[in-house]
Amino acid sequence: MEVAKTSRTGEWAGAVKSFLADICVRAVNAVGQVENDERMVDLDDIKVEKRQGGSIKDSTLVDGIILDKERVHAGMPRSISDASIALINSAIEVKKTEVDAKIQITDPNQLAAFLEEEEGYIRQLVETIKASGANVVICQKGIDDLAQHYMSKSGIFAIRRAKKSDMEALAKATNGRVITNIDDLSKDDLGKAARVEERKIGDSDMTFITGCEEAKSVSVLLRGGTEHVVDEIRRAFDDAVGVVSV
């Protein structure tokens, strides 16, 4: 703790300095791994988000992952308890092939059949996700509007276009596996969290995946009244983490 306080956080008032140092030490301790009787800390396992608004003491450590994302459909639940999380790095949409591009539809019945086939494909994807036991989907790529609709009807919370680094952090935090082929998705691939929740932070929404048992990746949300203050806090925190992790 004292080491953290003597880094760049020393530029702040005593109470704030202690507060940030405590978050820093707890974050490092949470992700530290013991190898050959030595503690190893991968700083990439501490995900830092910053958001203007509130006070410095609104900053917090989360035993899980914070995503600067909101759910893709307003009809989806805003929060999920006892979350089972599917981590998918492929698009949840109809696959377009060269054959599709060359199809010439001249009859209304043909068009109806074609659209029905596409809808059936999307519906089956969502049913496969649902059958795995997933009630949360984090997708690295896009999610088709129709897929959003069916997920919403099924009570699934979904996020699209998550960063690759966030997918990797989520896998570490939730003990889940990132999968490419939805047809192969099973309950064994799902990550676990006590809660997944969309929260209003400052002027926009963020998603908090919290209560991850034995999380090997954690998140810190840094707050401050102005952009300048938040940037300074981020620099101070990064400096302190670097010192503590040595």
Question: Model-derived features: where do they sit?
Answer:
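Core, soluble structural subunits of large cytosolic macromolecular machines
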Residues: 1-246
